[in-house]
A protein has these predicted regions:
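Short beta-strand-centered segment that lines the nucleotide-binding/catalytic pocket of NTP-utilizing
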Residues: 3, 39-51
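Short, basic phosphate-binding NTP loop
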Residues: 1-16
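Hydrophobic anchor at the start of a short beta-strand
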Residues: 14, 39-41, 138-140
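Flexible active-site lid/hinge loop adjacent to a nucleotide/diphosphate
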Residues: 58-142, 146, 154-156, 161, ...
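Short, well-ordered alpha-helices that flank and scaffold nucleotide-derived cofactor binding pockets
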Residues: 31-36, 53-57, 134
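ATP phosphate-binding P-loop of adenylate-forming
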Residues: 13-19, 27-28
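A conserved segment at the C-terminal end of the G1
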Residues: 25-42
Length: 177
C-alpha cells in the first residue's frame, strides 16, 4: 500500500491521525504546531500530499504528520506511528466495511504495531474508543472538550490543559490557536 511503502522508505517519527471526522483539521493544526517547533516536518496522507511523494526527503530528525483513512489502514503491515490518534468513530463508509464492527476494527489497526513506548491519543467522549483504550499496548492519552480528566488533555474554559499524575500543565488558550 502507499502508506506502507512510504513508511518503509521514510525516516523519522510518524504522528498518524485517523477518525471519522476532524482528521484534516487536526492534521493541519498539528502540522503547523510541529512546523513551528521543528525544522523537518512533513504533512501528508489524505490531507492532499501523497505520503510517498515526500518519503525520500525525510531524515532521521524529521516528523511526519499523516492523515490516515480507514481505506489506507486496511493494508498496513509494518506501519508504526510513534503517536497515533483516533479522534472519533461514527457510522461511515459502511458501503465498504459493511458493518460498524468492521469499520471500528479497521480504524483500530492504527495501533497494530505500536509498542509500549508509543502513544495513542483517544477521544474520551467516544465510548467505543474509551473501551478500546483499556486493552491496547501503547500508552493511552485521552482528550475531552466536555469534562476535566484525571489524566489527559481537556478544555477548562478557554484553556487547554494537560494533566499528568503529578501536575496540571496549561498548554494554550483556545483564542491563541
Amino acid at each position: 500500500s502507499e502508506v506502507e511503502l512510504a513508511y518503509r522508505t521514510g525516516k523519522g517519527e510518524v504522528l498518524a491521525i485517523t477518525g471519522t471526522n476532524g482528521k484534516t483539521t487536526t492534521t493541519a493544526l498539528l502540522g503547523k504546531i510541529m512546523g513551528d517547533a521543528r525544522e523537518s516536518v512533513f504533512v501528508v496522507g489524505n490531507i492532499g500530499t501523497a505520503y510517498t511523494s515526500k518519503s525520500l526527503e525525510m531524515r532521521e530528525d524529521s516528523v511526519t504528520v499523516a492523515e490516515i483513512s480507514s481505506f489506507q489502514l486496511e493494508t498496513i503491515d509494518q506501519f508504526r506511528p510513534k503517536v497515533s490518534a483516533i479522534l472519533n468513530i461514527t457510522e461511515d463508509h459502511l458501503n465498504r466495511h459493511h458493518t460498524m464492527e468492521e469499520y471500528i476494527r479497521v480504524k483500530e489497526l492504527i495501533t497494530k504495531n505500536q509498542g509500549p513506548e508509543d502513544v495513542c491519543v483517544l477521544n474520551y467522549e467516544d465510548e467505543v474508543l474509551r473501551k478500546f483504550g483499556e486493552n491496547i499496548v501503547p500508552k493511552v492519552v485521552y482528550f475531552s472538550s466536555l469534562r476535566k480528566l484525571d489524566q489527559g488533555i481537556y478544555l477548562d474554559g478557554d484553556q487547554i490543559i494537560l494533566k499528568t499524575e503529578k501536575e496540571e500543565i496549561p498548554i494554550v488558550k483556545t483564542g491563541e490557536l
